[in-house]
């Protein structure tokens, strides 16, 4: 009897690009020795749209609709960073009510983002049921967004100096009801997932990152906090009014895929705590800084010339960005979302550099999957939580 010869050479496999509802248009070139991963090369750029260059010939108000297309599952954060930069450049004060509204919207957006991470992550490792469950709660959040902003996604709600509109009548009660309901939903997820032996088999001791490695690779967000580093920009930078609320930074020390799952589940609970405190303590007053309406517009601007008057309505009130540079950052669901902004006394930014958390967190993927099994790639990639819109920009 002849024994079939076994192949000794390595196999190269293309994984992706995937459907946008899962991991987006990310392509991985994986080198395999049987089931073992020898090498992995991510290929990016399929969703590159030149977002940084577009910013250089748009005013901030004109650019706001573009930024919601970076991380299209947590659009409030991209809007927040876009208005925070010019606010700091122009030293524009935010009314207290507007700051509270912003915090509420940001934390709701964080929960929605974590929910839509949880569903596909569980589907990746073989649990289909949570994928359908998460849409119940996420739909309620989108109903709240729609009532306040008019849009379920791509809200275009933040403005320099405040927000576009005040909260509608009855919205606060509706949001408090959601918070009470959502806490029971998280308990259901934890019962279903956290102690499940098949789930634990797939995620424990898979994709381990030490605290030192996480810092050296520049990781942020749940990737960093799951490796034992208590670093959250909401505590570090005290932007908006986070220092007025009672909440804790959520972290784990194991550094594996399970730790990253636990950090995100705990973060959703903390977000609910912040939202409840903000809703109960929200002050009255204006929802935007009315001084911002009277920005110093350029005298005799070409926009006021005769030939421009009949093209469309005049552009929104805007102001010159001072000739200086600035780095602003917020704690987005995926990590540190930053903008490096250079003004040059023009209504357009001279440079608008985006620091997306997903792009930097993704750099460690080839190191994490080496010497792992092929099936573990989806577990590790899912635990990183990437959105290709912000990775490719």
UniProtKB/Swiss-Prot annotation:
Record-linked InterPro entries: NADH_Q_OxRdtase_suD (IPR001135), NADH_UbQ_OxRdtase_49kDa_CS (IPR014029), NDH1_su_D/H (IPR022885), NiFe-Hase_large (IPR029014)
Keyword Transport annotated: yes
Catalysed reaction, written as an equation: a plastoquinone + NADH + (n+1) H(+)(in) = a plastoquinol + NAD(+) + n H(+)(out); a plastoquinone + NADPH + (n+1) H(+)(in) = a plastoquinol + NADP(+) + n H(+)(out)
Major localization listed first in the record, in broad terms: plastid
Any one Pfam family match given in the protein's UniProt record, by short name: Complex1_49kDa
Gene3D superfamilies in the cross-refs: Cytochrome-c3 Hydrogenase, chain B
Gene Ontology CC terms: chloroplast thylakoid membrane
Transmembrane annotation, as ranges: none
SUPFAM superfamilies for the chain: HydB/Nqo4-like
MF-aspect GO terms: NAD binding; oxidoreductase activity, acting on NAD(P)H, quinone or similar compound as acceptor; quinone binding
Membrane disposition: Peripheral membrane protein
EC main group: translocase
Biological-process GO terms, alphabetical: photosynthesis, light reaction
Subcellular location as annotated: Plastid, Chloroplast thylakoid membrane
Record's signal peptide: none
EC number(s) on file: 7.1.1.-
Keywords (A to Z) from UniProt: Chloroplast, Membrane, NAD, NADP, Plastid, Plastoquinone, Quinone, Thylakoid, Translocase, Transport
PANTHER family found in the cross-reference section: NADH DEHYDROGENASE [UBIQUINONE] IRON-SULFUR PROTEIN 2, MITOCHONDRIAL, NADH-UBIQUINONE OXIDOREDUCTASE 49 KDA SUBUNIT
Family per record: Belongs to the complex I 49 kDa subunit family.
Task of the protein: NDH shuttles electrons from NAD(P)H:plastoquinone, via FMN and iron-sulfur (Fe-S) centers, to quinones in the photosynthetic chain and possibly in a chloroplast respiratory chain. The immediate electron acceptor for the enzyme in this species is believed to be plastoquinone. Couples the redox reaction to proton translocation, and thus conserves the redox energy in a proton gradient.
Subunit (UniProt): NDH is composed of at least 16 different subunits, 5 of which are encoded in the nucleus.
Protein name: NAD(P)H-quinone oxidoreductase subunit H, chloroplastic
